[in-house]
Every structure is written in C-alpha cells, then in structure tokens.
C-alpha cells in the first residue's frame, strides 16, 4: 500500500476561511457537532436551515475532499466527490447501499472520533491533504421526498495507531536497521502524540475525561436500532377453514422512524369487528420480552368464533399510542400462546377505532355460520415442534359444558407446559373492564376497549439469547391489582349494558342439564398441578362486577351466565415455569355446580401446595357469585390490593411425598455426582520406622547443641560473637592391627590444626602439627597469623577437604579461649602483668566491679585483679567501662559496704631443707640475673617520673624479668630444676591428701575464684596487699572471687608470681646484696632505701592484719572493720588502736618522699634500724630453712620484712599467745584452708610494739572516715568457717576479740592450714 502526502506550495501562513453555503428552505437544522451547538447562517430562520459550517475550523473550502460519506435511512454509501455531487437530491439514492451492520459501526465510530478507519482503508478512495484525509458527510436521514439538500459536514481524519500497526509490516523490510526502525518510530510518535507527558504526577483530570472526543455526531444509536428493526419479523400464518378461505398474514411494512419505543413489541391495529373485545385477557398479557425463537410460525385450526372468544387464541401484542406512553400488553390464551388472532363475524361496534392514526387493514373476517364443526387444535411449542394434538368435537354453542370443560383444560394444560413466561391475566371478563387497568411500565390506556377495531399483530423486538430467558425468567408482569375506580369512566358507563355480551354465551346456556358431571383427566391434572405456583388462585364463576351480589366495587368476578373462566394476575418472579392458574368451570344450576367447583378448587389447592411455604403470601380478593352459582374465589391481584379474605391452605400430602423422595435420594445418594477432583486417595501411607528409630537413638540428651559446621567467625559463646575463641581440628588415621585373632584399630598418624584468636588485634594465630593447645596459647605471638577469622575459616575448610581426601578422620571443636591464668600447669601461672601494659599503676587498672547493681560476682572477679585477665587483654582493660579514678576507688567500694578483699598468703607447706636450699639459691641467681638484665635493658622499663602513683615501678620490671624474657612475652621457660621441684611439690601434696589450691584451677573449683591459690598471688595485682591505699576484702559470694584486691603497686605483686620466686624475701635479699656490692647506682640505692623505710613503717599495718582479713571469702563476707583487723593482731591490748591503723593507710606514697604519717623522730628511728633489718634478713635466710613454696608465693615483701626484723621476739610472743588462747583450739578444728586463706600464727604475731606504736599517729577523724561501714563489734561467738559449715550467715558477722579462734577458722575453703610445730593452737599438719 502506498501512502501519498501532499505538501502545500504556498509559502504564506494558512488561514482557514469560513465557507457559506446556500440555505435550502426544506432542509432541517444542522447537526450539532462535538457536543457544542454550531451556529447556522444568518439566512436560516426558524426551521429553515442550510448546510452546516465545517466541523473543524481549519478546513477551508479550498481543501480538496478525499471522499464523501452519504447516510440514508436504509444504509450508507461511500463515493468520490464527482459521484456524490451528482446525487444532490433525496431521489437520487444509489441503488446499492451498505447496511448498518457491525462493520458500519466501526467505520462510523472512527469517523466520529476523527480517526482514519483502519479496517476499510483500502476500500476508501483516499486522497491525503497535509497528512490528513478530508471526509465530507452527507446526511439524508431526516429528509423526506420533498426535501432536497442534505446536511453536509466536513471532517478531517488523522492516522491512528491502528493504521500504523497495519501499515508498518507492509512498509518495512529486512533491509531496515535498528536505527531506521527507531527513527520511524520516533517520527510516528511525534506525529500521533505531539504532546507526550512524562510527568509522574497523576493527572486525574485526564483520567476522568474521555481521551477520544467526538468530532461529529452521526447518531449511531439510532442507526443501531434501525439495524435491529430491519431484522426479519415474525410471520404468523393461520389456516382458517371458515368458508373455505385461507388467510395468510405476512410481514408488515412500517415506517423506520418511530422514535424510541419503550416496549419491544409493536401492535398494529386494523379495523375489525367487536368480537375482538371478547377475547378476555389477550389484551393484558405481560409478555414484553419474548424472543423471536419463541414466536414461530404456527398453524392452528381454530374453533368457531363463539368459542374463540373464550379460548382467547391470540399472539403477543403491544399497543402504542402517539400521544401517550406505550403500554406493553401480551396475551396468552389457553388454546395457544402463538396462535394467530382470527377475525370474528360479530358486527358489534364495527366502526370504532383507537384515538390514533390507524394503519391499513387487510380485510374483514366473515361471520362463521357453522358452529358444529370438528376442529383440530395444533399447538406449537417454543421450538416450533407441535407438542400436543387434541381433538375435541365441538357440538356448538349449545353443547354440553363437559366438552367445554375438557377443551379448556386441555388448552390450559398445553399452555402450562409450553409457555415459558407468566401471563398477567386471563380474565373471565371482557377487556371492557381491564383495558384501563394500570400497567407496571405504562400508564392507563387512553382509549376504551369498546372502540377497538380489527387488529393485526406482529412481533417487533430485538433478538435475545434464549438461554438467558430460560435460565431465569424475568417476569416484568403488569399488575392487575387496581380497583374499579382506575377504570376509564367510559368503560364503567358501558359495563351494565355489556354484561351479557361479556359472558359471550347465549341465554340458552343457562338451560344446560345440571346432572352432567365434569369429566376429569387425572393424568393431565397431575401434570398441570406441578406447574402451578403457590400464588395461583382458585377461580370459579361469579356474579358480574357491579351486580348486587358483588362484595365490593373493586373486586373482579365473572358473569352469571354459565361456564366461565377467568385470568389471574400473577406477579411472581421465579426461575421455574410459571403457568396460568387452574380454571374452574361450574354448571349453571343447583348444587352440582357448587360441588364441581369445590372439587376443582380442591384439586387446585393440592397442586399448589408445593410452593406454599417457599413463596411469599399474596393478598387475595374473595367475591361472591350470582344467585344461581354462588362460589368463592380467591384472586391474588398484587400487594397493593386489600386482603379481603384469608388464603386457603392446601393439603400437605404432596409435600410429604416430596420430603420422602428427598430423604430417599439423600440416603442412597441418587442425585450425588462426585467429581474426580473431590476423590482424593485414601490409601494408608506406610512410614519406615527404622530411620526414625535410628534418629531417636542418635539424639543427644544435652540441652546445649553445637552445630558441627560452626565456623570460628560465626560461633557464639556466652551470648556474644565477640568472645575470643579457639578452633582445634584433630586429624587421625586408623591402622588395623591384628592382636591375635582379634583385629583392632589404633591411631597411626595424628596431627591437629589449632587456630587461636588474638585479643590484641583480632588476628588468628594458627599452627599445624602434633602440638598441644596450651603450647600454642603460650607461643601464639611467635606463630603465623591470619588477618581475621573469616580467612581462618577458609583455611580450615580447605585443609579439612585435603585431609579428608587423604583418608584422615576429622574431629573438631570450637571453644572459648582460656584465660592466661588457666593455660599453664599447676603453679606455673604467667605474670599477671602480661595482661596489663607494663608500667601501669594498679590504681589505673582499678576495676569498679561492684558499683553496678546486679553484677555477678563471677563477672566482677573476671574483671578484677585476680589473674583472670584474658591473654593480651590490654584493649579489654583500657576499654573497660567500669574503671574509676585511683583517688576515690576505695571510697566508692567502701560505699557499697563490701570490699573485694586482699589476696593473702596461705599456710606454708613444709618442704625438705635440701629443696628449700636449692630453690633459694636458684632464686637468688635469677634475681641477680634480672637485675643485670634490667640494667642492660633500661628501655624496657618505664621511668618512675611518669607514674607518680607507683613508687615501685623500677621493681616492677625487675620482678617480671625474673620469670620472663625481656620482651615481656607470656611464654615461661622452665628449667629442669623448676620442673623437678614442681613435680616433687605435687607429689608431696598428694601423699599428704591435701587439696592444694596452687592455681586458679583448684581455687575456682572450690568456688573461691582466682587469686586464692599460691600461684594466683602473682595474678592478683595487689598480691602483696601492702604499699597501697586500696584494701579490698571478703569476696562477693561463693561463686565469685573472694580475692579481687587492688593496690597502687602492681610490680610488687608480681614479685611473688614467678614459680621460682618461692621466697619473696630473696628478692629483697638480692637487692640488699647488690646494695652492699655496689652493683646499683646511687639513684637506685636511694630509691630502695625509701622503699624499705616505707615497708618498715607499714609492715605491721599492711602485712599481717590485711593478709589475715583477705582470707574470708564465699558466703562469709567480712566488712572492713577495726575488729576484723585487730583481732588478728598479736597485741590484744591495742585492739582498737591497731584496727584504726590497720584498716587504712596512706593513700599513696610519692617516690622520694617519706611516710607522711610519721613524725621526724620515727623517721630517724627507721633510718637507724635499716642496717639492723638487713642483718636480720640475711641471718634468717641462712639460719632458717626455706619456708613452704605456697607461703613464699603468697607472702608480700612487707610481711617478709617484718618477719626478718622481729623474728626472735615474736616467736616468744607467739608461744605465749598460743598457750593463752584456749578458745582457739575449740573454734579451730582441723580445717582445709583456701590457698589464699590460710595464715600462721607466726605471721600474725610478727608485729612488735614499736610497729603498733607506729600505727597510732592517726586522728580520730580519719578513723571515723574509714570505719562507718564496719560491722558491729560485740561479744559473741564467731562462726567457724570450714568446709563443714557452708551455710549462709550474716553478711556482716559480729566479731569479738573474746571469741576469736585461730586464723584458719576465718576461711571456708577446703585447704588444710599448717602452722609451725610450736603452735599449740595450730591445725594438724
């Protein structure tokens, strides 16, 4: 298809000109376009109008018209301009017209919208002007033969998307590239949619408006109705044998313009005789929407006119008046719904006509002389098939009523079975009374029935789907329920005169033999009863409407001339077939008529009982018949009619019968149709029990399940993924070895992959080989490292896959990384200072563990100074949120009422003198080496000027180096001598059946927490408990740490941590030897001199009393009090004074300063006593065998200094004290003391009177500041704290010096206390 475009050669701007057409007087007004009135020319006045203006203002007369569309009443045509100009008048209609079919609707709708039709574009002689097609529409539909000129409109048709879609395949080919396609698409889009809105905002105004605006109004709805009216009409043919004349009624020509018809049926009237009035209810039947399929051609041999008047043979009809609303009236007679209406011979009122223009009539029916003729009634069903052939002999008007009865019942039965639509009424009175009744959809008739002429009826309606009608019948039934007051006055005036005419029976019908009985047909009655609804009335003959016997003026009753039948206004809507009611006919004389009517009513009641309960009740009207045949009838009119009498209830026999049928059908499932979808499988499913049994047997009963596939980076311990973890994967190969005749599998090659997460930087140290996990922990800083745990998991996955391929058995587990204090063997705990940065003061590390309410004691101990610090826990300590300033840490802890406690030395274990000598000599060598190491590596220590709160920072590094390498690493290197001594120590403990808490393992097992064993002395930062103002005592519970004390000197506490530093005094002895030999610099000499002075001044204060108190742990919580300290002192005379000084000391000692609490005389005395103290220390080391390793690990340098100064005087006092306290032997049974709880009487009695006097310079104000939280001091027995007495006791036990037992009774840890042999009050060793 080729598309041509015409480009204008004129260069000036286009200005459309208004075209003026000559007006034609006979032409109608111009058609209104686009919903807006178009102004006509000035020459058009009134009804005279010429051609309309162009529909689009931009179309000028100069534009050439492409094609012309001519619209005619019966079709349309499309032609060229030359052809159309010749057809200037209505007479020149082309012979060939296109009908208004569906294709025409698509064409005309596209032209109305201003679009170029897409389906018939090829057939239209197109000529494009500026890219559009100009169409000229000539409308001849509103013109008559006298009118010449049509209404002309010009319209511009644009291309639409439909045209583009159809033309693109013909235009494009395979040679087009993608760019060509996009170019064409963009141009087409720009031409079709010049304004493309891409704004995302919603445009509700565009959504509500119709995007297609009509450019021209072609009245397509009128054309559609025209097309429907042009469909074939119903042709009803009737063969009437009257006088040998055959009457054939064919389709009628009618005008195509009748306007909008509310009804679907058109009634055309012809002049006929008055016999048409006597057709009863044929005028009032309410079949408004009967499809054409239900009105087939039927041929009925009709009965004589006298009988036709009562049989009501007729077809559907509609009456329309030009001056009023149309009334849809349809009639259905017993003889047949679709039978053709005959023309009667009754000449009554032959000249009457309707108040309207009458159409031409085709003929008059002659009178019917022959009444006694045998007739054949052929009834046609909805499908055009004859349903029943009934032959009855009509004996004439004077025949028996039985024949009439049978005939009427037969016709009624046929109608009930065949009709699919309810009838409004089949009245037993003439249309004189009912013509004026109000219709439901139309007003009252504007003409009396007496003026009706002969009428001819044809069906004019749109086709409908029969399935829609049959499935659910829409009963638009006109109501009959209006009173006689609604009747036309002219009809009421004629009623008395036409009383006998309405009956349509001669007077001789009253003389019918009353003895004749009505013949019944039970089979037909049964079939008929199934179609009767509950609202169908029981009818009988009665008196005339305005007779004296009529009950009310508004009631409808029959005449009194004999056999009659009436009609019922059934206003019922139901899916089922609604049939006309039973018709009761009576004889005219005597009680036989009443009996016959009663029998008919009884049968009708039994037949109607089926719908009695399911349908709504309808009001009824009861009337009284004539004097001859007085019967009671019930005629339901509609809801607006008053209820005169009660409705008669029917028998329940049939209802019971149906209920039995339903029960039987439900019992045997007769009407139950099952679908295959509903039939699901009922096969029993078999489940294998063996897999379930195996699964249940392999289930673990543990509550904590560990996923075998957990990775190091995703495993959770303690509710957090940030816990440092260790992953150990064991690999092993099993080798089969025959041991005799029994094969056995033994591991042949074993190796493991250990991955340990570092706490310092988050890297993962890993090692592969046959190595223990503990060795990896200690040397993890020297191993290979991975950047993070994710890389470590990837390495482990790869390694596992390789080992599995080699046939190794794999077993792995992920565990929380053990703390540094738990890694080594017993008594081999590394330095606690490794957990803290070296050189930091203890006050800087002070943990405020008890300040938070609800904190567990275990957590406090974990963060405390008991050696439970994780490996390389520098960042943990620095990030701890519970660190407090060093100056007020004690006050905050004391405000809580409980202090954490001070690590105290335990009862020393007796070792052989040879072992003691060896250890002592080895320790001296190590101390000397450490001193030289410190001198060689001065950069490893921090100067004391940086730490003003740490007076012994120089000793810190020296004590650490005694058991560590200079790099400060945490891997201890044991010599063979150390391992031998440790082994002997353990054997001795096992032989004596003593549970040695030499490490945190035993201490934690007893529920006492870390820091309570021998080795945990070093793990506790304040292991010495001296030279500081931090005094924490009495742990927070059985499960917590009893020893979480802190002080300002972490270095001093580390002196006793090394397993080889079994005698803490050896450190000072080595220092003293170095002082004598001049190995130290003068600055170091001065520093150590000041340290020894401070130790001597406070040796009794911080030595024995504090170590005695710190042993109280677990449930036996002790508050810091004067009694708690004084009762442990040897000087019982100075209890209160010693307690005041023992509970507190100077907050801090500045380097290079003397004790601030000493006067000048005391300081001078201390300076004089320094050589004597050194000599005593040296003599004690040479004379006395070395003490037990546990005591030397736990004792602080202050206590050793006090022991060296006053050893001989205190021994004598100790013997006196042991013999003078009889209660001690009672209150101190053989106990197993905690590693940090046991102390000896010798240690308690190391304070001299001079030291006690040194404690006294303290103001009462300071005493009051330190003692407000102390427990009450009263007389009473103290609970013996042993393993046999673990019950809870008051948090602050009342202590008294009168009832204090041995020091070992203060603890409840299962550790035996061993005192000197000369201690009579000591425990059994």
UniProtKB/Swiss-Prot annotation:
GO MF, one annotated term: transcription coregulator activity
Mutant phenotype after disruption: Late flowering, especially under long-day conditions. Reduced expression of FT and SOC1.
Principal cellular location given in the protein's record: nucleus
Biased segments, Low complexity type: 596-607, 1160-1224, 1240-1262
Statement: the UniProt record of this protein carries the keyword Glycosyltransferase: no
Basic and acidic residues bias locations: 518-529
Keywords: Cytoplasm, Flowering, Nucleus, Receptor
Segments of skewed composition (Polar residues): 313-331, 504-515, 863-875, 1225-1239, 1263-1286, 1293-1325
Induction: Repressed post-transcriptionally by white light (at protein level).
Location within or outside the cell: Nucleus; Nucleus, Nuclear body; Cytoplasmic granule; Cytoplasm
Assembly with partners or alone: Component of a red light-dependent nuclear complex made of PHL, PHYB and CO. Interacts directly with PHYB and CO; CO binding requires the presence of PHYB.
Role according to the record: Triggers photoperiod-monitored flowering by repressing PHYB-dependent flowering negative regulation, probably through physical interactions with PHYB and CO.
PANTHER family cross-referenced by the UniProt entry: TRANSCRIPTION FACTOR SPT20 HOMOLOG
Protein name, per record: Protein PHYTOCHROME-DEPENDENT LATE-FLOWERING
Species: Arabidopsis thaliana
Originating gene: PHL
């Amino acid at each position: 298809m080729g598309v041509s475009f015409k480009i204008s050669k004129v260069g000036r701007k286009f200005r459309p000109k208004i075209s003026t057409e000559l007006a034609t007087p006979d032409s109608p007004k111009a058609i209104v376009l686009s919903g807006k009135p178009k102004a006509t020319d000035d020459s058009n006045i009134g009804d005279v109008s010429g051609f309309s203006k162009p529909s689009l203002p931009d179309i000028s007369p100069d534009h050439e018209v492409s094609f012309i569309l001519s619209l005619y009443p019966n079709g349309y045509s499309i032609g060229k301009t030359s052809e159309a100009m010749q057809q200037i008048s209505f007479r020149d209609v082309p012979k060939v017209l296109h009908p208004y079919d569906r294709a025409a609707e698509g064409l005309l709708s596209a032209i109305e919208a201003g679009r170029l039709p897409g389906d018939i574009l090829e057939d239209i002689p197109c000529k494009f002007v500026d890219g559009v097609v100009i169409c000229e529409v000539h409308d001849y539909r509103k013109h008559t033969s006298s009118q010449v000129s049509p209404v002309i409109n010009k319209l511009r048709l644009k291309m639409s998307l439909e045209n583009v879609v159809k033309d693109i395949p013909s235009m494009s080919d395979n040679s087009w590239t993608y760019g060509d396609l996009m170019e064409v698409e963009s141009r087409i889009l720009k031409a079709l949619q010049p304004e493309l809105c891409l704004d995302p905002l919603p445009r509700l105004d565009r959504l509500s408006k119709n995007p297609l605006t009509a450019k021209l109004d072609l009245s397509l709805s009128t054309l559609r109705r025209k097309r429907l009216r042009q469909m074939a009409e119903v042709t009803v043919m009737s063969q009437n044998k009257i006088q040998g004349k055959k009457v054939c009624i064919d389709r009628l020509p009618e005008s195509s313009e009748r306007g909008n018809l509310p009804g679907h049926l058109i009634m055309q009237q012809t002049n006929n005789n008055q016999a048409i009035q006597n057709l009863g209810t044929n005028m009032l039947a309410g079949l408004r929407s009967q499809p054409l399929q239900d009105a087939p051609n039927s041929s009925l041999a009709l009965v004589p006119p006298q009988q036709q008047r009562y049989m009501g043979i007729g077809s559907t009809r509609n009456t329309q008046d030009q001056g009023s609303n149309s009334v849809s009236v349809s009639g259905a007679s017993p003889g047949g719904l679709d039978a053709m209406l005959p023309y009667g011979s009754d000449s009554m009122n032959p000249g009457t006509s309707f108040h309207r223009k009458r159409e031409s009539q085709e003929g008059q029916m002659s009178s019917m002389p022959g009444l006694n003729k045998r007739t054949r009634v052929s009834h046609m069903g909805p499908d055009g098939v004859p349903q029943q052939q009934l032959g009855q002999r009509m004996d004439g008007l004077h025949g028996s009523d039985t024949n009439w009865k049978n005939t009427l019942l037969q016709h009624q039965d046929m109608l009930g079975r065949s009709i699919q639509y309810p009838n409004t009424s089949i009245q037993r009175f003439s249309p004189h009374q009912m013509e004026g009744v109000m219709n439901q959809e139309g007003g009252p008739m504007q003409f009396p029935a007496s003026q009706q002429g002969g009428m001819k009826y044809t069906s004019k309606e749109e086709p409908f789907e029969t399935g829609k009608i049959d499935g659910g019948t829409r009963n638009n039934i006109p109501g009959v329920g209006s009173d006689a007051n609604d009747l036309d006055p002219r009809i009421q005036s004629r009623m008395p005169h036409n009383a006998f005419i309405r009956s349509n029976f001669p007077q001789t019908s009253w003389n019918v033999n009353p003895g004749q009985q009505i013949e019944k047909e039970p089979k037909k009655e049964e079939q008929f009863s199934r179609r009767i609804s509950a609202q169908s009335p029981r009818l009988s003959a009665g008196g005339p409407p305005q007779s004296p016997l009529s009950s009310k003026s508004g009631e409808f009753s029959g005449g009194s001339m004999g056999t009659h039948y009436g009609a019922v206004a059934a206003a019922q809507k139901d899916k089922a077939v609604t049939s006309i009611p039973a018709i009761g006919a009576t004889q005219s004389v005597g009680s036989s008529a009443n009996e016959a009517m009663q029998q008919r009513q009884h049968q009708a009641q039994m037949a109607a009982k089926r719908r009695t309960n399911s349908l709504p009740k309808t009001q009824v009207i009861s009337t009284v018949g004539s004097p001859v045949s007085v019967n009671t009838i019930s005629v339901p009119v509609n809801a607006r009619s008053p209820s005169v009498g009660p409705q008669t209830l029917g028998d329940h026999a049939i209802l019971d019968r149906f209920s039995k049928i339903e029960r039987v059908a439900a019992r045997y499932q007769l009407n139950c149709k099952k679908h295959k979808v509903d039939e699901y499988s009922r096969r029993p499913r078999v489940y294998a029990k063996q897999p379930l049994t195996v699964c249940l047997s392999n289930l673990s009963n543990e509550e904590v399940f560990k996923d075998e596939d957990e990775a190091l980076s995703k495993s959770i311990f303690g509710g957090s993924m940030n816990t440092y973890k260790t992953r150990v994967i064991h690999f092993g190969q099993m080798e089969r070895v025959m041991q005799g005749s029994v094969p056995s599998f033994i591991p042949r090659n074993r190796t493991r992959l250990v991955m340990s997460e570092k706490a310092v930087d988050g890297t993962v140290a890993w090692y592969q080989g046959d190595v223990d996990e503990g060795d990896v922990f200690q040397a993890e800083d020297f191993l290979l490292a991975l950047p993070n745990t994710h890389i470590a998991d990837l390495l482990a996955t790869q390694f596992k896959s390789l080992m599995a391929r080699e046939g190794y058995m794999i077993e792995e587990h992920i565990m929380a990384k053990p703390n540094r204090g738990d890694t080594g063997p017993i008594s081999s705990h590394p330095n606690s200072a490794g957990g803290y940065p070296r050189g930091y003061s203890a006050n800087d590390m002070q943990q405020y563990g008890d300040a938070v309410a609800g904190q567990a004691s275990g957590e406090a101990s974990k963060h405390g100074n008991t050696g439970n610090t994780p490996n390389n826990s520098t960042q943990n300590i620095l990030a701890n949120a519970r660190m407090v300033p060093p100056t007020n840490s004690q006050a905050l802890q004391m405000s809580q009422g409980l202090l954490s406690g001070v690590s105290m030395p335990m009862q020393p274990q007796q070792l052989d003198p040879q072992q003691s000598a060896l250890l002592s000599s080895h320790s001296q060598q190590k101390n000397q080496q450490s001193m030289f190491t410190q001198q060689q590596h001065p950069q490893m220590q921090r100067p004391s000027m940086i730490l003003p709160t740490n007076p012994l920072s120089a000793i810190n590094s020296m004590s650490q180096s005694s058991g560590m390498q200079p790099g400060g690493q945490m891997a201890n290197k044991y010599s063979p001598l150390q391992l031998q001594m440790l082994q002997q120590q353990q054997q001795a403990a096992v032989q004596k059946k003593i549970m040695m808490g030499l490490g945190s393992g035993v201490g934690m097992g007893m529920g006492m927490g870390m820091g309570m064993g021998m080795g945990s002395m070093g793990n506790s930062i304040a292991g010495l408990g001296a030279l500081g103002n931090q005094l924490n005592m009495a742990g927070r519970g059985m499960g917590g740490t009893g020893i979480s004390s802190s002080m300002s000197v972490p270095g001093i506490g580390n002196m006793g941590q090394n397993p080889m530093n079994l005698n803490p005094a050896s450190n000072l002895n080595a220092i003293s030897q170095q002082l004598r030999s001049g190995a130290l610099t003068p600055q170091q000499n001065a520093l150590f001199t000041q340290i020894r002075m401070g130790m001597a001044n406070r040796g009794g204060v911080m030595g024995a009393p504090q170590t005695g108190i710190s042993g109280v742990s677990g449930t036996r919580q002790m508050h810091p009090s004067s009694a708690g300290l004084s009762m442990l002192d040897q000087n019982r005379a100075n209890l209160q004074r010693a307690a005041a000084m023992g509970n507190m000391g100077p907050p801090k000692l500045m380097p290079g300063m003397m004790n601030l609490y000493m006067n000048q005389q005391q300081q001078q005395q201390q300076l004089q006593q320094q050589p004597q103290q050194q000599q005593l220390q040296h003599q004690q080391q040479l004379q006395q065998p070395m003490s037990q390793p546990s005591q030397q690990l736990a004792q602080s340098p202050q206590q050793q200094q006090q022991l060296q100064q006053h050893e001989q005087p205190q021994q004598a006092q100790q013997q006196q004290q042991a013999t003078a306290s009889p209660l001690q032997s009672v209150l101190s049974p053989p106990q197993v003391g905690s590693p940090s709880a046991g102390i000896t009487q010798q240690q308690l009695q190391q304070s001299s009177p001079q030291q006690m006097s040194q404690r006294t310079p303290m103001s009462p104000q300071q005493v009051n500041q330190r003692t407000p939280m102390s427990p009450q001091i009263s007389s009473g027995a103290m609970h013996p704290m042993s393993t046999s007495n673990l019950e809870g006791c008051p948090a602050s036990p009342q202590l008294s010096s009168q009832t204090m037992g041995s020091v070992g009774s203060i603890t409840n840890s299962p550790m035996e206390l061993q005192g000197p042999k000369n201690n009579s009050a000591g425990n059994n060793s």
